[in-house]
């Protein structure tokens, strides 16, 4: 009896989560118009560009290497800045905790349409333990890499907002065209 109730509850939980559109985190459903795009960066082999390229591949996006093509959407990574601010201090006035900020500026260029800016900010805190001076550098590098990966995930997710903005622009243009056509007919 107890086994049947557990099986029933587990089955119900699966149905509820599947029915509401729940998906495990991981890949982002990129719009079909952006399934093939050009990834353009001033540092094509840098860690941020590699992280963005990996996230695009995980989302089944084909990356075209020919940056001269004008018929494909283009994701351009304009720049990234890292900053580090003091979040707390020890009694002796030395920094105890840093807030690390990674800001990424990018833009999506859709041929024959607009240019859409994308901005991503990722925040992390880092505890500066003076007793572990040697481990600090490697820990900071691990945190920076995680921040780059998180920024790359956010950029790929923001492609959905670009797609929505593009559709909205097309709908407004179609509505304006219909209004103009109806005025001419009258």
From Swiss-Prot:
Transmembrane segments: none annotated. Residues 1-19 form the signal peptide. The keyword Glycoprotein does not apply. A lipid is attached at residue 20 (N-palmitoyl cysteine). Belongs to the LptE lipoprotein family. It is a lipid-anchor. Component of the lipopolysaccharide transport and assembly complex. Interacts with LptD. It comes from Serratia proteamaculans (strain 568). A lipid is attached at residue 20 (S-diacylglycerol cysteine). Together with LptD, is involved in the assembly of lipopolysaccharide (LPS) at the surface of the outer membrane. Required for the proper assembly of LptD. Binds LPS and may serve as the LPS recognition site at the outer membrane. Its main location: membrane. It comes from the Bacteria. InterPro entries: LPS_assembly_LptE. Keywords: Cell outer membrane, Lipoprotein, Membrane, Palmitate, Signal. Pfam families: LptE. GO terms for cellular component: cell outer membrane; transporter complex. This is LPS-assembly lipoprotein LptE. One of its GO terms (biological process) is Gram-negative-bacterium-type cell outer membrane assembly. It is found in: Cell outer membrane. GO terms for molecular function: lipopolysaccharide binding. PANTHER family: LPS-ASSEMBLY LIPOPROTEIN LPTE.
